Amino acid sequence: MPAGLHLKDVMSTAQTVSSAHFESLHKKLADRTARIGVIGLGYVGLPLVLLFSEQNFRVTGFDIDKTKVDTLAQGGSYIVRIPETEIQAAQAAGFTATTDYSRIAEMDAVLIAVPTPLNDHHEPDLSFIVATAEAIAPHLRAGQLIVLESTTYPGTTEELLVPILEKNPRGLKAARGENNGNSTFFVAFSPEREDPGNDTVARADIPKVAGGFNPAATELCCKLYGAIFHRTVPVSAPAVAEMTKLLENIYRCVNIALVNELKMLCLRMGINIWEVIQAASTKPFGFHPFYPGPGIGGHCIPLDPFYLSWKAKEFDCQTRFIELAGEVNTAMPYHVLASVGEALNRQKKALNGAKVLVLGVAYKKDIDDLRESPALTIIELLQKQGAEVSYHDPYFPFVGKGRKYDLQMKRVPLENFGQYDCVLIVTDHSDYDYARIVRESQLVVDTRNATRGISAPNLVRC
């Protein structure tokens, strides 16, 4: 086990200060009779529902989106990678979904998996956590375990979540230190580690980090997740678990920024960055490949550096390296815009008035997730320059209003590529026939190396 807290040490401490509530919940988790509540039925929450249902726990899902709740009630799925058969199997195991938060009182453990976006000033927007905590508090009862999974800055669990929960009408307090009395509830942070579209690692094989507000909460959290994950990793405090999640994603953000910057240098030097990365990957130690692209997307990697930078200012610390990585990645859609303009210019065409087909709007290949997708930024930038933009994505027949954009665009058919002045590959979905696209298009600009192995005068990689 990595350096840090060992579960046997946590268990020893917790058992010496156990309460009737602690023992009761521990037993329920062991014999699978605990009622599990999952708040937020999106890309993180719904997979959690399925994992617990597979282990014969009775699960209740909570969401403010009635459309999602109704879809699940009918045995349907709104996430492409989760088939309806899995929803129906969960229902057979007792899963129900509701918008009624009063049913929180029925739960033994409540997992919070709600969004934590940034506001327009790149500052943390924790309004969903606040609203969820305020919805839980009136129905909180002694002995419940509340676990926050949403990605956030270190200190959120202790400084934000717990004080709101402790405003409950029963006067219950979060268990602290050795106080696990009968008027307490248990609190922990356990960061989600979902990787949409990654089929190489089973969800149950992803180790689960858990940091409780006290040792008893850590043990209960590990007991809870130990039922669905093959390994749990206890740490000494929620803030350690919160920082762990940020480190994981900032590591990726910084390395992606590095290869994005190297890509722009290699373009000027006439060197193929993809060939460079492939060659460097043959080194059996000290190197891990990261790949350039049109920008970064998803809920975590584009946002987490700004969460930590914001919190660091409270401690008079400037995280310049992290902030620079965020700036490099944020600038990549502008690099794509410039590359399209230059490619059109070489064909004696202007970007203003050009017909551009954007292939792929999901933030990465083979998923139905638009969150923070660089494609949305690129479409808006092209439109502002006067381009006539269309798009195709096998997972999105329509792109409407989102957190930052209101594009209101319908997917066009995947045909007649020659009618467009430029076909821009933003997301390299496996469904696309790239050889055909290059063959039938006037100009193709590839931001993902999707056309590797293809050579043509109308093909530009950027």
Language-model-detected regions and their locations in the chain:
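Structural/interface elements that position substrates and couple domains in central-metabolism enzymes
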Residues: 2-462
